[in-house]
Regions:
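Thiamine diphosphate
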Residues: 2-6, 12-210, 214, 217-366, ...
């Protein structure tokens, strides 16, 4: 049954954009954000790509490296979301190959390859199914360099499609980043645009530490922009200000960026200026960028799709409070998913633009 559901995921993603329009939710293609300073050169001379095409382009460049391989369920024929399309044809079966349906085995195999000097890219077909590999990631990959005194490294990349997709339910729509941002030794990334996805993916491939690259699957086809077809990287641990503002700072990442942008635009029409920050990297994260913004505005809202209690936003709010306590003019606020398993009725569960607008008004008028 899982196979049948997974096979239909491509159709679900394609349909979700139209469904979202019918229900009035925000679409990523409505927004174009300017590159941050220093990134414009890397992104110029672009070709229009959606996010899955940008990931495919990044993987193509990565596989051109001598000791890089790609493995996972169905990656040889292109994968459920087509991110690995034609890569086996171009790079051969020794570089791109299928694995059995066992996440623990996929990641464990990748850890072994990394331990002997290869740089594997392991795909977990849905982030919801990453938990059988939790021990391999947290107890093996993340600790490998530490327990060898940095004499050996475990440079590997785990790709995992994540987050809401329209009506994926409890096993195909979860945001699981908070389980891994608590683990020293890992680097965690979640892009919000095609150009970010390619540049950050290639930077992860250059890292000597294990990286988890979460790909918001609702953006695979709905997020479209010009992407440089050549090799380029973007730095890990660096966020960017998408919209400058003076009244309140809003911090987010992944597909929630577009929801936050819609809420910020709605607030602007009511005379409220929102500064919007896309973290991009969750571990490490750009603590200084956020602190500087909050000290300027005096107010902050953190938003993500994952449940609120003990979520990643709690760490952000705690750190912001430590750094900006004397500058805060209102309590830091979190607008997150509900503390329930992920339901089929996503619009009820997710922190949509109307919930964010209410939070913006509440914080600004505190």
């Amino acid at each position: 049954m899982r196979r049948l559901f997974d096979a239909s995921a491509t159709a679900v993603v394609a349909a979700s954009s139209a469904a979202a329009k019918r229900h009035g939710s925000v679409q990523p293609s409505e927004f174009v954000f300017a590159p941050a300073p220093g990134e414009e050169e890397a992104m110029r001379n672009g070709v229009k790509m959606n996010l899955f095409q940008a990931v495919n382009s990044g993987l193509d460049h990565a596989l051109s490296k001598e000791r890089t391989v790609l493995l996972g369920e169905d990656v040889a024929f292109g994968g459920v979301f087509r991110c690995t399309l034609d890569l086996r044809k171009k790079h051969g079966p020794q570089k791109v190959f299928d694995s059995p349906l066992t996440e623990q085995g996929i990641v464990g195999f990748a850890v072994g390859m990394a331990a002997v000097g290869w740089h594997p890219i392991a795909e977990v077909q849905f982030a919801d199914y990453i938990f059988p590999a939790f021990d391999q990631i947290v107890n093996e990959a993340a600790k490998y360099r530490f327990r060898t005194g940095s004499n050996f490294h475990c440079g590997m990349l785990i790709r995992a499609p994540c987050s809401a997709v329209g009506h994926g339910g409890i096993y195909h729509s979860q945001s699981v980043e908070g389980y891994f941002t608590h683990c020293p030794g890992l680097k965690i990334v979640m892009p919000s645009s095609p150009s970010e996805a390619k540049g950050l993916l290639l930077k992860c491939v250059e890292e000597n530490d294990p990286c988890i690259f979460f790909e918001p699957k609702i953006l695979y086809r709905s997020a479209v922009e010009e992407v440089n077809p050549d090799y380029y990287t973007l730095p890990l641990g660096k966020g960017r200000i998408l919209v400058e503002g003076r009244d309140v700072t809003m911090v987010t990442y992944g597909s929630q960026v577009y929801v936050a942008a819609k809420a910020a635009e709605m607030a602007r029409k009511e005379g409220i200026s929102v500064e919007l920050i896309d973290l991009r990297s969750l571990l490490p994260w750009d603590r200084q960028l956020v602190a500087d913004s909050v000290k300027k505005t005096g107010k902050v809202i953190v938003t993500h799709e994952a449940p609120k209690t003990s979520g990643y936003g709690a760490e952000l709010v705690s750190s912001i409070t430590e750094d900006c306590f004397l500058s805060l003019e209102a309590p830091p606020t979190r607008v997150c998913g509900l503390d329930t398993p992920f339901p089929l009725h996503e619009r009820l569960y997710l922190p949509n633009e109307l919930k964010l607008l209410d939070a913006i008004k509440s914080v600004v008028h505190f």
